[in-house]
Amino acid sequence: MSTILESLPTGQKVGIAFSGGLDTSAALHWMKLKGAVPYAYTANLGQPDEDDYDAIPKRAIEYGAAGARLIDCRAQLVAEGIAALQSGAFHITTAGVTYFNTTPIGRAVTGTMLVAAMKEDGVNIWGDGSTYKGNDIERFYRYGLLVNPDLKIYKPWLDQTFIDELGGRAEMSEFMNQAGFAYKMSAEKAYSTDSNLLGATHEAKDLESLESGIKIVNPIMGVAFWRDDVKIAAEEVTVRFEAGQPVALNGVEFNDQVELLLEANRIGGRHGLGMSDQIENRIIEAKSRGIYEAPGLALLYIAYERLVTGIHNEDTIEQYRENGRRLGRLLYQGRWFDPQAIMLRETAQRWVARAITGEVKIELRRGNDYSILSTKSPNLTYQPERLSMEKVASTFSPRDRIGQLTMRNLDITDTRDKLRVYSQVGLLTPGEASALPQIKGDGDK
């Protein structure tokens, strides 16, 4: 039996993820007029562009909701964000600049916590504002059904009747005004923005063109660092971790992780840290483009990665990075709570993050321009005396190194023999500018 309802289930409770914006406001009132019993659920994700959460459920009641609840998701959001940080669950990068998967993390939290609240109220039909071309429709589908196996999905934007009657923002605005709500449609921006406490996503409209760049974006979590008239002074900041958890910024300890991340956002935001422009593959494999902000996570990530490289050995770091990229894809696909994701995440948290204790001092300048000034940790395996060029007591002698190099003759001989074979069969034809050894066949020795 299909879990997708293509028409409005009249006479039944329908939960809607309610942002208070034009789309969900019009959808809620339309459902009420058409005979459904709408319930509104609003997630407080610490969105930097929302200044009055308490007013949102009140508006939902005015528009016809039989019930409206505000769900505080901030603590869970930050907990999942730090888990992603600890496991390096970030697979989208361009030239070393990272997208921190802030929207996928937000969807994992929203999709589970709102549906859990609906289930408490006996609401087993859920709608939201995601479109059929995007990632969120699948993310919410997966997370919702994980929490409530009896859940049915109704999305007004998949209902042809709704589309025919209220297919655009102008029609929605007129509909709300005619209903007596004096709803003023906000001014159209050149792009769409979605945000939470971890970061902001700017995409669509003018940003669909790769001829448009970051300069058309007005940041909501930091400064437009590319503008000459924006003055940004260099700033030194210290970040301290204990057993993989960020605990202090500039010597100030935080018992509340939400407050710590808010302060990290303020510090990083003063410099435009963590902004990136990415081309990515959506879940359906079509490419999309987004410009992202994540000043706080970026700041914490710099310090965390510095400690990872100073504490763990090469093979552990390599496995951490490989697993992190795989986990990032699973997170992006809406599989953050799938068994394979839990396995990868908990492996990193147990065997990588638990050893990360220390403090890193960073100088922030403009955008992603920074320098690491100092690194301290009781767990460092970096010991400069082991490789010092000065005359110090050493853990190995020149004769030890001669023996080690002599043992390398075995694999060097194997490599030389393989290169000769490749040359004989025509796979290697070194040119004049090639750095390949001039390996010849047996007859040319």
Swiss-Prot record:
Sections of the chain in a coiled coil: none
GO cellular component, one term: cytoplasm
Residues involved in L-aspartate binding: 131, 135-136
One GO BP annotation of this record: argininosuccinate metabolic process
Alphabetic keyword roster: Amino-acid biosynthesis, Arginine biosynthesis, ATP-binding, Cytoplasm, Ligase, Nucleotide-binding
Ligand binding (ATP): 17-25, 43, 129, 131, 136, 194
Enzyme class: ligase
Protein localization: Cytoplasm
Residues given in the record as L-citrulline binding sites: 99, 135, 139, 192, 201, 203, 280
UniProt-recorded Gene Ontology molecular function terms: argininosuccinate synthase activity; ATP binding; protein homodimerization activity
Family annotation (SUPFAM superfamilies): Adenine nucleotide alpha hydrolases-like (SSF52402), Argininosuccinate synthetase, C-terminal domain (SSF69864)
Matching Pfam families: Arginosuc_syn_C (PF20979), Arginosuc_synth (PF00764)
Protein EC: 6.3.4.5
Keyword Ribosomal protein found: no
Chief location of this protein within or outside the cell: cytoplasm
Catalytic activity: L-citrulline + L-aspartate + ATP = 2-(N(omega)-L-arginino)succinate + AMP + diphosphate + H(+)
Pathway(s) it belongs to: Amino-acid biosynthesis; L-arginine biosynthesis; L-arginine from L-ornithine and carbamoyl phosphate: step 2/3
Family stated for the protein in its record: Belongs to the argininosuccinate synthase family. Type 2 subfamily.
Quaternary structure (record): Homotetramer.
HAMAP family noted in UniProt: Arg_succ_synth_type2 (MF_00581)
PANTHER family (UniProt xref): ARGININOSUCCINATE SYNTHASE
Name listed for the protein in its UniProt record: Argininosuccinate synthase
Source species: Burkholderia cenocepacia (strain ATCC BAA-245 / DSM 16553 / LMG 16656 / NCTC 13227 / J2315 / CF5610)
